[in-house]
């Protein structure tokens, strides 16, 4: 091998050498093939390679694939081919096994209620080695779908669930690090039915002892959830004074709202009994006849 320190050579110095001779020249040599005259076809430029063994990446430190580095030109290769014409150099980044994304294992179910603001979830909090991977971006994984009414913005999950999932729903998120590595995290959401908004009153200003409960009418006042309210008390008739009646509300949207019960108080007036007394006056007339 002719080292790179040799900068000139006699043009006919190899003319009488064996035809099978290979003239090896360092890859960084300044000598051109023409400098060897008729022996130029025997010249092969070669790298002087040093092997680096493969090393697995950890959650805190990058690893590398098996690769070779030329001692002379400092280029990197993924094979031990030394021929300059056939060896393909790669960027050093191609030899690196980047740090994998480490995400926490989600074991807790996330409980929400239909139509109510959920507690904001910062999905970045699930990444255990964000600094080592240079930060991550988050998106809903391919093939997975977000819950209706929820939004993902900048890695933060928020919103009002717009559909009940009493048996739960899994949503998978993909975390992508700046180094290109990815990891998935699946969260299990439980969305419970909401209690409807109900304000019940009994129709009518006055009620009397003995009024039949079955004839009382309930009215919904205020901003109520759509549905039907009915009295379900076993009381047949109102008693004098306060009567606590139980009602049941059945929402129209029974898929997303619970059936609820409550009570309403009805005041009943005492029945007034009027007694009429009749007085009879008898007049007796006495006639006196004088005696003669």
What do these predicted regions represent?
Residues 270-292:
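Ser/Thr/Gly/Pro-rich low-complexity, disordered linker/stalk segments of secreted
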Residues 41-101:
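Thrombospondin type-1
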Residues 27, 69-85, 173-181, 247-260:
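Enriched for extracellular/lumenal, surface-exposed ectodomains of secreted and cell-surface proteins
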Residues 101-137, 190-223:
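Solvent-exposed, low-complexity, repeat-rich "mucin-like" stalks and linkers
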Residues 1, 8-19, 33-39, 70, ...:
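Core hydrophobic positions of leucine-rich repeats
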Residues 1-8, 18-32, 44-45, 58-59:
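Structural signature of tandem-repeat unit edges
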Residues 181-192, 260-269:
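C-terminal edge beta-strand
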Residues 51-65, 139-144, 148-176, 221-266:
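Serine/threonine-rich, repeat-prone extracellular segments and beta-strand-based repeat modules
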């Amino acid at each position: 091998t002719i080292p790179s320190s040799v900068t000139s050579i006699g043009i006919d110095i190899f003319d009488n050498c064996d035809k099978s001779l290979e003239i090896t020249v360092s890859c960084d040599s300044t000598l051109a093939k023409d400098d060897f005259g008729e022996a130029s076809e025997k010249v092969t430029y070669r790298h002087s390679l040093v092997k680096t063994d493969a090393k697995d990446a950890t959650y805190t430190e990058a690893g590398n694939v098996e690769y070779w580095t030329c001692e002379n030109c400092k280029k990197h290769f993924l094979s031990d081919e030394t021929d300059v014409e056939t060896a393909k150099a790669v960027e050093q980044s191609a030899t690196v096994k980047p740090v994998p994304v480490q995400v926490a294992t989600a074991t807790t179910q996330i409980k929400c209620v239909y139509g109510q603001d959920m507690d904001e979830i910062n999905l970045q909090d699930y990444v255990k080695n964000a600094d080592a991977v240079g930060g991550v971006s988050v998106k809903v994984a391919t093939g997975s779908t977000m819950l209706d009414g929820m939004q993902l913005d900048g890695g933060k999950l928020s919103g009002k669930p717009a559909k009940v999932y009493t048996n739960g729903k899994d949503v998978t998120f993909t975390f992508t690090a700046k180094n290109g590595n990815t990891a998935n995290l699946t969260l299990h959401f439980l969305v419970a039915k909401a209690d409807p908004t109900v304000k019940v009153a009994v129709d009518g200003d006055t009620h009397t002892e003995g009024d039949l409960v079955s004839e009382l009418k309930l009215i919904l006042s205020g901003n109520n959830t759509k549905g039907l309210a009915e009295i379900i008390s076993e009381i047949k008739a109102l008693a004098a004074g306060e009567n606590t009646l139980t009602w049941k509300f059945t929402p129209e949207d029974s898929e997303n709202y619970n059936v609820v019960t409550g009570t309403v108080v009805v005041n009943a007036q005492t029945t007034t009994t009027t007694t009429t007394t009749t007085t009879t006056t008898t007049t007796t007339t006495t006639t006196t006849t004088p005696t003669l």
